[in-house]
Amino acid sequence: MDNHGPRYPYPYGQYPYPYPYPAPYRPPSSEPYPPPPTNQYSAPYYPYPPPPYATPPPYASPPPPHQHTSGSHSGPLDYSHNPQPSSLAAAPPEYHRHSFDYQPSPYPYQPQGNFGAYGPPPPHYSYQEPAQYPPPETKPQEPLPPPQQTQGFQEYRRQDCLSTGGTGHDNVSNSGSSYPPVDELLGGLHISTNQPGPSVPQLSSLPSNSWQSRPGDLYGYPNSSFPSNSHLPQLGRVDSSSSYYASTESPHSADMQMTLFGKGSLKVLLLHGNLDIWIYHAKNLPNMDMFHKTLGDMFGRLPGKIEGQLTSKITSDPYVSVSVAGAVIGRTYVMSNSENPVWMQHFYVPVAHHAAEVHFVVKDSDVVGSQLIGLVTIPVEQIYSGAKIEGTYPILNSNGKPCKPGANLSLSIQYTPMDKLSVYHHGVGAGPDYQGVPGTYFPLRKGGTVRLYQDAHVPEGMLPGIRLDNGMSYEHGKCWHDMFDAIRQARRLIYITGWSVWHKVKLIRDKLGPASECTLGELLRSKSQEGVRVLLLIWDDPTSRSILGYKTDGVMATHDEETRRFFKHSSVQVLLCPRNAGKRHSWVKQREVGTIYTHHQKNVIVDADAGGNRRKIIAFVGGLDLCDGRYDTPQHPLFRTLQTIHKDDFHNPTFTGNLSGCPREPWHDLHSKIDGPAAYDVLTNFEERWLKAAKPSGIKKFKTSYDDALLRIDRIPDILGVSDTPTVSENDPEAWHVQIFRSIDSNSVKGFPKDPKDATCKNLVCGKNVLIDMSIHTAYVKAIRAAQHFIYIENQYFIGSSYNWNAHKDIGANNLIPMEIALKIAEKIRANERFAAYIVIPMWPEGVPTGAATQRILYWQHKTIQMMYETIYKALVETGLEGAFSPQDYLNFFCLGNREMVDGIDNSGTGSPSNANTPQALSRKSRRFMVYVHSKGMVVDDEYVVIGSANINQRSMEGTRDTEIAMGAYQPQHTWARKHSGPRGQIYGYRMSLWAEHMATLDDCFTQPESIECVRKVRTMGERNWKQFAAEEVSDMRGHLLKYPVEVDRKGKVRPLPGSETFPDVGGNIVGSFIAIQENLTI
């Protein structure tokens, strides 16, 4: 989102959905892993759309429990009988999967490439098994006896929830407390000491009572496929500020465990890798819908139609969610009206959790909530060796007893650690067979070109020249110039999506002439008069209204109603799109989604000249909205442009009241232009969203329909299709391979399958009453895991991995990104290899820094940073390097700021705030302000780049909150695998250009960001710049990079800087404060 604080709250909620990368699977075959080919991926590259798939390969999934890996099977598999234990399968595929045992059916758009990512490949496809991870040589032991006792279920807040009566609700609680009541939970807890055990315990060495002695699991995080404030089970009340969560210092202590039944403890181990899980079926589930059955029996006695309509049996609608350390990592679809459901569903999911058990929670889905049926737990110690655990297990209730005689769940689970997943060992890879990020809706598109942008505009000569390989020089892009030219040159279509689009914004401001006087609205209106189809898809801010002459600007000040009114009598079609929940969601959930969440994508899609009187599609993707406050240059002026290029474009939501003489808020952002096949995927995203938003409902059915507004480019002869668009040879040093990622769900797009069993054909995740594309999170995890040297991130937010915080583990910020970065660094420390992570964030979230929402965001950010440094320090201690290095030799956080002396003429305006102690007066006196980092980008090893609209927090990564889009790209001729040294392609030039902007210099050590010399040099520059920014004396700042104003000691403890506990001039605790407000307002 783009604004914060009381003026623009940025509410966040819990993460209600897992992180599986779904993929279609055939029924388990007898040969799940064929001999490896010469390279890891050999699926051919198809045109768009690809041809219908042939019969899926027989190896596409692991075998079911009843089928052995030897032999062959030429006919359909029979799943009518109970699965029996089988021999251990070979190592699973190396990517996250989540699939059903159903034959995928053709659909209009079929992504292609790697079969796991884009659907089944042709029969000749083969998959490489990781050579260094041989299959276990022994068969698994018989299923272990069922536990006689089991702990109470941990926190499953906002999804899998259960009241004391057994029923949970999916809607948001209306109580004032931020946390659900579970006070008496501690009353049943038993503290036990857990002696260190073997790091990789053998199944045969497990204690005989391991099933009877489940540990208390108080680093449980919300199982949030179904948002709710209730827990599972509801055992009393815990206040977050005073509970065990708030006081626990160790996020993953192996020395102390809590058990609800006092039956011993289990060892907490780090699961970092992938889990290969099959959920086959359940039997003899209890009927949880007895109330409905009673009503049915009552009405069944009535004569006539009612009797005939109620004769069918009413029973449970079960589903299973899989959680590790309380964070949901997988979820089956709901089987309606079944006490013997058969799912045959597969998950291949990334994990980065300290946990003692894996939980399989069986629930009954209801319209108003969900009821607990029971639980199956698998101790992590049993799977840690890599052995496949498979069998049928009794489903136990919260008392540790069978929920019903004979009720059981058949499943299998196998863990593959990171060091056995070779796909993450070589960066983006080399050669034509690399297929990008698997398990995504859109495939990797080869042979395109990309232009990378920093800020809205870079004037000529403002940044230094950067030499690249092949004697080339990096060319600094001019984003809004290029957008203006692309729109002006369009002949067929101009499609724009935005969180905010303002018709008054001027894209060209550095030249004299008509272009500099032309507003965006005038440009679009003139193009529509030329016959170009101009469509604007803008988020409909629910707080802005224009009804019968009554107008409100809205809390977010997005100008949505103003822009709609401007184009009202033109041929430009403006569709204001609210962020709606599905019809099957509860009323409260619908209100929450519609009020809190947004459409956050920022795209411009136009047709462009393809030569030969043909047209092609190009697209702009990134973080820049076409609205006020966004135009800026790498100088990021505060006062000097207030009477020139920013005269009619003042933006600074930090200040309230009199703005006279205040500094503007400088704006730093990242954007990109895509030319090639991937641009058509951006077009597909727009079409899917437009068709969904244009579908009339309610009173809108009587209004003008927008359904026919989209151009059918396949029916326009002069517009090339994706398979015909010009491509660049992979051998061309300027060739790019590009992939589009999204965070979005089926409530915001048209085209997702209605049947969840068909969802895996498009690599979608199942949620309650919704299908989810969360491939942005998938892409970040893949890129971080594959990083070998350094990671450079610029992002508006940095919150996540709350399941590993030292407090408030249950808020639901469960995205893996911060934990994956910390574990990557820890892995490199243990390997005695250099690695560095540089993370640039805003000084504070946009808005009033003393506001409750802003302070809570800073608090969660502090918890995230603290967790990462503690993880790094632990690795230093384990390797005996804590004396030689500190955590900041590997990980550093920065922000941006600027300061201007008064030049000859003070352009800050006339007058000054009357109160000398207001933030306005103090900022004008000190002549300093932060540069707001609105970027959403990451560079890995100078070979891979991600740029989009998604922030690093739950709201952007979850897929069911804000809608987001991003692109990931690399140049095949500029990778470590090909060069065997640091690549010097366009991505390297882009990163160096950003550093030149932030530090006002280019040092030789910048070419090796992972080196200790570079890390310390950059940190020293940031510390020096912060001192200049915070000093009493006013001076011009050359560089803008500031060390984030917290103190990190050698043990990784993060504290406020002594004497600088609050932000200069504007106030607000730098490390935030815990203020009890609704969680989804801040994560």
Curated annotation (Swiss-Prot):
Domain PLD phosphodiesterase span(s) in chain numbering: 595-630, 929-956
Localisation: Cytoplasm; Membrane
Activity dependence on pH, as recorded: Optimum pH is 6.5 to 7.5.
Activity regulation statement: Inhibited by neomycin. Up-regulated by PIP2 binding.
Keyword Mitochondrion included in the entry's annotation: no
Listed name of the protein: Phospholipase D beta 1
Cofactor(s), names only, from the UniProt record: Ca(2+)
Record's compositionally biased regions (Pro residues): 26-38, 46-66, 132-148
Enzyme class: hydrolase
Source superkingdom: Eukaryota
Residues at which Ca(2+) binds: 455, 636, 668, 997
Region (Disordered): 26-231
GO cellular component: cytoplasm; membrane; plasmodesma
Keyword annotations: Calcium, Cytoplasm, Hydrolase, Lipid degradation, Lipid metabolism, Membrane, Metal-binding, Repeat
One GO term of the biological process aspect: defense response to bacterium
CDD domains: C2_plant_PLD
One Pfam match: PLD_C
